[in-house]
């Protein structure tokens, strides 16, 4: 009887120890699994979308969109948690330029060699910021204020950072990001190449559709009652543009003088559509439309996306496709 009690005790202890060991192993496995995930952090939506397409269904990669939907990239400043996220990343992708001056300070603080860092603008042919017809002047940091109507010089060496708006640059960005993923996760290189090629095919398809609209245009001028962060797009399709502000402006309310200028341009050239960009209410565009008989329409510049579009999984391709109908009406 005593022997049976001892054996029962031994069995119970063994069961308890087995459970503890299994729990420890499972805990370590989970911890290791989370730790082993490849962490990729990007600053802007276009790079996020391209990487999302390249990575595909790979659950071993954790992709973070630092800016997040619904926010203005020009006024963004990283939080303490954002800095930690970048520091813990295997790959950090940023655009640079005036829009992301904060990145310089962040990069200086990173541990050397811990995080692979790429400035995606290095992989495309950038252009200097251009003066836009109708655009009000805006101040760059450390520049003197210019009176309205005065010639304005952009900061020396400043480039237009809205590189993703042309299909040509979008393809270059996808190729560059795919190669970076190969570097940090070579075992999945074939999958990354395949996914990148599929996405590039989609970009080429939407490019072809937009080019067809441009080929059949009645006019070549787009009018923005807003800032105009689409110079690469405008140059790529050989269009003309008038806007209230250039692409780097943080202003949202144009002066009466600027509104009058745009209204006159619309009336003189019989412009059918007044454009405003995502995350804007379109109030100014609607005001000008009411005065001129034109129609106010939103165009997607992929500067960022709304929370709704983000949650619905909208992409560079789907948002550019949304622009096709807008362009048909604007260029008729």
Question: At which residue positions do the language-model features occur?
Answer:
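Extracytoplasmic metal-acquisition and chelation regions
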Residues: 2-332
